[in-house]
Amino acid sequence: MSMPNIVPPAEVRTEGLSLEEYDEEQVRLMEERCILVNPDDVAYGEASKKTCHLMSNINAPKDLLHRAFSVFLFRPSDGALLLQRRADEKITFPGMWTNTCCSHPLSIKGEVKEENQIGVRRAASRKLEHELGVPTSSTPPDSFTYLTRIHYLAPSDGLWGEHEIDYILFSTTPTEHTGNPNEVSDTRYVTKPELQAMFEDESNSFTPWFKLIARDFLFGWWDQLLARRNEKGEVDAKSLEDLSDNKVWKM
C-alpha cells in the first residue's frame, strides 16, 4: 500500500497558526515529535504533534497518519476498569471521558523500536506516570498485554482531530494513581455494567477512539478477562495473550 504524499517538512502546514488561546503546557507538548506511518503501520518519518493533529493535514489529499496507543488498566481484585476524564486544558477532545491513558510513542530513542511493540510499551509506561502519577518502575514494558491495532479518523472540532493507528494495551498491574490536573480532571473505576450505563447517559461525552474500541472489542475482551480469573480470583491481562493479532482494523 502506498504511503501518504507528504511534502517535507510537514511543519509548513502550521505556518501562521496561533496557539495563544490554549494552555501553555499543552502548547509545549504540541512540539513533541510523533511517528508518521502509512496505513500498514510502516514508519517513514516524524512530525510535530501539532502538525499531526491539524485537520488540514489529516484530511485528503495529505492523509497524515501517526502511531498511538490506548491503555486499559483493570483492577486485579475485581476487574474494574480505570477511566479518566480529560482535562479542560487539553487541546483535543477536552473534558471527555476515555480509557485509562491514550497518547503517542515519540520519535525518540527507545520508543521507535517496533519488535514486540517495545517502543509503544515504553511510551505507555512514560505517559501513565505523566498523566496519572503511576511510577514507571511499576509498569515495565512486559506488564502490558498487546491485543491489536485500530486505524481511525476523528475530528475534534473544525481545526483539530485524530488520525491514528492505535495500539491497544491491557494491564492489570496493581498500582495507585494521582491525576495530573493539566491532563486529567477526574478518574473513576467502573465495572462493565457501570460503563454501559455511562454510555447510555447522554450527559456524558466520550472520546471517539474509546467509543469505537468499546463498540467492537472492549466488552468481549472484558468478558474473557473476567472469565479467566486466576486461582486467587484475580484478573490477569496476561491470560488474554492468545487473543492478540497482527491486524490493523480500519474503523
Curated annotation (Swiss-Prot):
Write down the Pfam families for this protein, in alphabetical order: NUDIX (PF00293)
Mind telling me which InterPro entries this protein's record contains?
A: IsopentenylPP_isomerase_typ1, NUDIX_hydrolase-like_dom_sf, NUDIX_hydrolase_dom
Q: Which leading EC class covers this enzyme?
A: isomerase
Task: Specify the pathway.
Answer: Isoprenoid biosynthesis; dimethylallyl diphosphate biosynthesis; dimethylallyl diphosphate from isopentenyl diphosphate: step 1/1
Spell out the reaction equation it catalyses: isopentenyl diphosphate = dimethylallyl diphosphate
Its keywords, alphabetically, are: Cytoplasm, Isomerase, Isoprene biosynthesis, Lipid biosynthesis, Lipid metabolism, Magnesium, Metal-binding, Steroid biosynthesis, Steroid metabolism, Sterol biosynthesis, Sterol metabolism
In terms of superkingdom, the source organism counts as Eukaryota
The entry's localization annotation reads: Cytoplasm
Q: Which cofactor does it need?
A: Mg(2+)
Cite the GO molecular-function annotations of the record.
isopentenyl-diphosphate delta-isomerase activity; metal ion binding
- List, for all copies, the residue spans of the domain called Nudix hydrolase: 64-212
GO cellular-component terms in the record? cytoplasm
Record-annotated active site: C102, E164
Q: What is its EC number?
A: 5.3.3.2
Recorded family membership: Belongs to the IPP isomerase type 1 family.
Name by which UniProt lists this protein: Isopentenyl-diphosphate delta-isomerase
